[in-house]
Amino acid sequence: MTITEIKNLLQGEVSKEQLEELKADERKGVQKLLISYEKRQAKYAKALAQFQSRFSYEKEFWQKDQLVAGVDEVGRGPLAGPVVTAAVILPHDFDLIDVNDSKKLSPKKRQALFPKILEKAVSVSVGLANNDVIDQINIYEADRLAMAHAVQGLKVKPDALLVDAMNVPLNIPQVKLIHGDAKSNSIAAASIVAKVFRDNLMDAYGELYPEYDFKHNAGYGTREHMEALEKYGPTPIHRRSFAPVSEYEK
């Protein structure tokens, strides 16, 4: 085989016999390709092991034939826009090994995973609390309310919840996990769904209120955002209970 043919071969599945043949090939180009292949395989094996370890909490419920939903939120800190939550029930054979804490993933990777999670999950639901609700009952309670809405929106009722550092106000057994999106694939999937949903929503708000640069700041208090607040005052989606938004009321 030519070097190009071997390179193409090593991009897919390779049998043990083929690998042995290639290892016996003394061409430097072939040996260099083999080194790269083995590095990729080692990296994949490590990622797969980490992915499988993030199902340890789910397996405790699966072993009892119970459905478990991961629940997470995004958007507690911004000065504008809603807090968005998601609840996700994953099947036992879920195999998207790139699913991880959404904060560890690039926007491009999150957007790519979003439709795949929707396709492979048993059920996905999103809940949100807008800025008016946040101003009325505070961000913590609004977050809990949105989580409850997300869980209630699932097409099948879970037997238990895995929740990232919160308690959901529902009569369902729950496991609260600090940094849960890095410990549970179900919570990680929920974090990706919530993040992409909110980012897309803030992009739409960016079209509606272009002066505030919501497409790039997602409602957080960047310099451009603060300058727009000072110049134009708050929009209908700003959280008046958050300092310093109220200071800029016109």
Curated annotation (Swiss-Prot):
Gene3D superfamilies: Ribonuclease H-like superfamily/Ribonuclease H
GO BP terms: DNA replication, removal of RNA primer; mismatch repair
Location in or out of the cell: Cytoplasm
Enzyme Commission number(s) from the entry: 3.1.26.4
Enzyme class: hydrolase
Alphabetical list of InterPro entries matching this protein: RNase_HII, RNase_HII/HIII, RNase_HII/HIII_dom, RNaseH-like_sf, RNaseH_sf
Keywords tagged on the record: Cytoplasm, Endonuclease, Hydrolase, Manganese, Metal-binding, Nuclease
Reactions catalysed according to its record: Endonucleolytic cleavage to 5'-phosphomonoester
Binding site for a divalent metal cation: D72, E73, D164
Entry GO terms, CC: cytoplasm; ribonuclease H2 complex
Principal subcellular localisation of the protein: cytoplasm
UniProt keyword annotation of Metal-binding present: yes
Residues in RNase H type-2 domain copies: 66-250
Record function comment: Endonuclease that specifically degrades the RNA of RNA-DNA hybrids.
Protein name: Ribonuclease HII
Organism: Lactobacillus johnsonii (strain CNCM I-12250 / La1 / NCC 533)
